[in-house]
Design a protein with these regions (language model features):
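An amphipathic alpha-helix adjacent to DNA-recognition modules
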Residues: 37, 41-44, 48
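Structured surface interface patches that mediate subunit assembly and partner/cofactor docking
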Residues: 2-17, 21-32, 48-180
Length: 180
């Protein structure tokens, strides 16, 4: 496995714990207008798009009546399989930054997305909200220079002022517009 594959696997495991622990998929999430199900479907659909890009097939999405836990589990395994196959991991897909190899997109975008949505799903469903501290630090330092770009509609909302003495996780979440 590569460093990115390992990091992805660790973060996906954390998200998986929240998916497996979710009992109310209709719970309101911190993402405006989204339920817990919407958060899990968003992450799953992102994975499905990358898998389709690696395989040269048309992307599928999670159906409204589909078991989101099963869809997530399958999509996670499929993306992990892509990441451990050097030729598939090197396949180019479209990203917010332009064309990018899948492995690079996972490292730059998907890992951050999974990390943040782990918290969103945990908050929505009353589960453990603690995030991987090393991933929090890396994500925060990676996103700070992209502040203007990530404020575009549909990415992240306006920053929230963190409380005095906030830990790194709280600072990251507030930077991304989450109310902690």
């Amino acid at each position: 496995m590569t460093d990115i594959s390992d990091r992805f696997d660790n973060l996906a495991s954390d998200f998986d714990a929240r998916v497996q622990g979710t009992t109310d998929w209709s719970a309101t999430s911190p993402c405006e207008g989204w339920t817990a199900r919407d958060v899990a479907v968003h992450v799953t659909n992102n994975f499905l798009g990358l898998v389709a890009g690696a395989n040269g097939t048309e992307s599928t999405t999670v159906a409204a009546d589909e078991d989101v836990t099963a869809a997530w589990t399958d999509a996670r395994a499929a993306l992990q399989a892509v990441l451990v196959d050097p030729s598939k991991a090197a396949a180019t897909v479209q990203s917010p930054f332009g064309p990018m190899p899948i492995e690079q997109m996972v490292g730059r975008i998907i890992c951050a997305d999974v990390l943040i949505h782990t918290w969103d799903l945990a908050r929505a469903t009353g589960q453990d909200e603690s995030l991987n501290a090393e991933a929090v630090e890396g994500t925060y330092s990676g996103l700070k220079p992209m502040d203007a770009m990530i404020r575009q509609p549909g990415i992240f909302g306006p920053k929230v002022t963190p409380p005095a003495g906030a830990d790194a996780q709280t600072e990251l979440l507030c930077f991304l517009g989450r109310t902690v």
